[in-house]
């Protein structure tokens, strides 16, 4: 879990466009964030297993 100060800092607009970085909307994790869903891989997997992300199904072949 990210510190509250880091989450608040991320919500502010960056001074320069290169300073902006993605953070998970649910837990605030800065690494391995899927831009399309704005979730980290851990949160994405949890929500996908629960069926809370529409259109996402477990792959089987």
Curated annotation (Swiss-Prot):
Keywords: Metal-binding, Ribonucleoprotein, Ribosomal protein, RNA-binding, rRNA-binding, Zinc. One of its GO terms (cellular component) is small ribosomal subunit. Zn(2+) binds at residues 24, 27, 40, 43. GO terms for molecular function: rRNA binding; structural constituent of ribosome; zinc ion binding. Transmembrane segments: none annotated. Belongs to the universal ribosomal protein uS14 family. Zinc-binding uS14 subfamily. This is Small ribosomal subunit protein uS14B. It comes from Streptococcus equi subsp. zooepidemicus (strain MGCS10565). The gene is rpsZ.
């Amino acid at each position: 879990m990210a510190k509250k100060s880091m989450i608040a800092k991320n919500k502010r607009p960056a001074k320069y466009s290169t300073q902006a970085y993605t953070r998970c909307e649910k837990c605030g994790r800065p690494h391995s964030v899927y831009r399309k869903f704005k979730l980290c891989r851990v949160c994405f997997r949890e929500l996908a297993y629960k069926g809370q992300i529409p259109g996402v199904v477990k792959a089987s072949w």
